[in-house]
From Swiss-Prot:
Transmembrane residue ranges: 9-29
Organism: Postia placenta (strain ATCC 44394 / Madison 698-R)
Main enzyme class: oxidoreductase
Name of the protein this chain belongs to: Cytochrome P450 monooxygenase 205
Classification via Gene3D superfamilies: Cytochrome P450
Residues of this chain annotated as glycosylated in UniProt: 332, 434
PANTHER family assigned: CYTOCHROME P450, CYTOCHROME P450 12A4, MITOCHONDRIAL-RELATED
Gene name tied to this protein: CYP205
């Protein structure tokens, strides 16, 4: 190592130490002065991890639900370095937080870690930049556009059926199949075609991984896991970001591939759109209706003010955003739906009978939406098994959050609002709200599609963008692609439940949920195999 390199490392070390000391002082002051310290909650378990290790050691929402039962609707617990975090299931408070997206934003730590992988896409940016991107992207996710994409959903769902039939032919009936694997391949293929007209061809039995597929696999894996120390330190202490590590190198290499191929796609699509605008006839087919093409068309509109246009970099950042947001969530939601159907065979059969009442294998979006029991099954799956169980916001300014239900603070005083200081983190408990007995009744933990025939009045206050639940959040940062996800999920369930009968391949107690950004199934006795959902599958034969 040269003298210059040593000097650079020493300088970085000194800078990192100075930043760390400064941040530690600021954090100590914040902990000591935060109004959250007066809110009741569980005792601190560890100075470094706070209560986070307890949370990650249990299934999503289980520990939180226990805390609510013991300490009430509004509590605090400890996060990284014992910092206070607000936790509330008060629907008025949550509505206030979600509707004031400028005042309550994603934490810098989460934005850095996600941004390192995804770039400055819609999931990451805040404020005016978010509004600008969303304004351009909204039309691409409207009902008319999703209606045009339904053909892709149905086609890929049928291809997954062929994929599993091939597995069954090899091993006999019923075949033990990891359904999560096939569903992940299918949703990746869908978002490739529907997102930017790119064929990943993951469901091709004889296919080989392509360059872009491999790059995104690296990016997906980098988002998994808990307590990766150096990436966490880099997020907290910016000078450390200048020191390369193995994870950063892998991400940089994958992003280089994504950038090169993404810019090729964008350049090609822009040229096609401009040629069409110049008078050449554009083909009216699905290939010209993918989300990226619609985004570029909207961005090139002649009536769009120049200040509202996105740069090519902003457009490029949406490619990995489409993939991450539209791939993992839908595949895991559908996997949990199939799991729920194995635990309620009468529901599975009732659903199958409704699906067979449609005299086509290629339903339209409207036909899928006209199936009431399918709608109820999807709603109940998203309620009980929300793919994203929680999220975090941070107060960007001192504020007072209103409450429906007052709480008693640690000094015995009744409080009808929550005071927060700038920098205070707030946990948004998506799954806890979805499974709240106070809102949904004593059977809230149970999978019962029939509950959607008449829902309790209390759930009308849940601040969700869809179906009186929090699964797609609410407010200005509600999931922009919820219609896309729901129709894709319906197309999958339609094809799969018509084609196959499903049973769980292991005892129910063997299945657990991994606590990560997305809820993934695991088998307790096969943890070394990673996330999986093994089901016994056999073809369904109509009588």
């Amino acid at each position: 190592m040269t003298v210059t390199a040593v000097n650079v490392l020493i300088s970085l070390g000194v800078a990192a130490l100075a930043v760390a000391v400064w941040k530690a002082i600021v954090m100590v002051i914040q902990i000591a002065t935060s109004p959250l310290r007066n809110i009741p909650g569980p005792p601190n378990s560890n100075w470094v991890y706070g209560n986070l290790k307890e949370i990650f050691a249990t299934e999503n929402s289980v520990l939180h639900e226990g805390w609510v039962a013991k300490y009430g609707n509004t509590i605090k617990y400890k996060g990284w370095l014992s910092r206070n975090r607000l936790f509330t299931v008060d629907t008025r408070a949550l509505n206030y937080i979600l509707s004031h997206s400028n005042e309550y934003q994603k934490p810098a730590l989460a934005r850095y870690n996600l941004g390192e992988v995804l770039g400055e896409g819609l999931l990451i940016v805040e404020g005016e930049q978010h509004r600008q991107q969303r304004r351009i992207m909204n039309p691409a996710f409207g009902p008319a556009q999703i209606r045009e994409l339904t053909e892709i959903f149905v086609e890929k769902a049928q291809k997954l059926c062929l994929f599993w039939r091939n597995e069954i032919s090899k091993s006999g009936e019923p075949a033990r199949i990891d359904v999560l694997n096939g569903l992940s391949k299918m949703t990746l293929d869908v978002i490739g075609l529907a997102g930017f007209n790119y064929e990943f061809d993951s469901l091709n039995i004889d296919g080989k991984p392509n360059e872009l597929n491999q790059a995104f696999s690296v990016m997906f894996r980098s988002l998994e896991g808990f307590a990766i120390v150096f990436p966490l330190l880099k997020a907290l202490i910016p000078p450390l970001r200048l020191i390369p590590d193995g994870r950063s190198r892998r991400i940089a290499k994958a992003r280089k591939v994504m950038r090169r191929m993404g810019m090729e796609l964008i350049t090609k699509k822009k040229a096609e759109i401009l040629r069409a605008a110049a008078g050449e006839k554009e083909k009216d087919n699905l290939q010209s209706r993918d989300l990226l093409t619609l985004l570029i068309k909207a961005n090139l509109a002649t009536d769009l003010p120049e200040s509202h246009r996105l740069s090519d970099e902003d457009v490029l950042a949406q490619v990995p955003t489409f993939l991450v947001a539209g791939h993992e969530t839908t595949s895991n939601a559908t996997a949990w739906c199939l799991y729920a159907l194995t635990q309620a065979p009468e529901v599975q059969q009732k659903l199958r009978e409704e699906l067979w009442s449609i005299p086509t294998e290629n339903p339209s979006m409207d036909e899928l939406n006209e199936l009431p029991y399918l709608e109820a099954v999807v709603r109940e799956t998203m309620r009980v098994h929300a793919p994203v169980p929680s999220t975090i916001r941070v107060a960007m300014t001192d504020d007072v959050i209103p409450l429906d239900t007052p709480f008693v603070d640690v000094h015995g005083q009744v409080q009808d609002s929550i005071r927060v200081k700038k920098g205070d983190p707030i946990f948004i408990p998506i799954l806890v709200i979805n499974r709240s007995k106070a809102l949904w009744g004593e059977d809230a933990f149970e999978f019962k599609p029939e509950r959607w025939e008449s829902v309790p009045d209390a759930v009308q206050h849940i601040p969700g963008v869809w179906a009186n639940q929090m699964s797609f959040l609410g407010g200005p940062r509600a999931c922009i692609g919820y219609r896309f996800s729901l129709i894709e999920m319906k197309a999958l369930i339609f094809a799969l439940v018509r084609a196959f009968e499903f049973e769980l391949a292991v005892p129910p107690e063997e299945i657990m949920k991994k606590s990560t950004a997305v809820q993934r199934p695991l088998v307790r006795s096969e943890m070394d195999k990673g996330c999986q959902l093994p089901l016994l599958i056999k073809p369904y034969h109509t009588v």
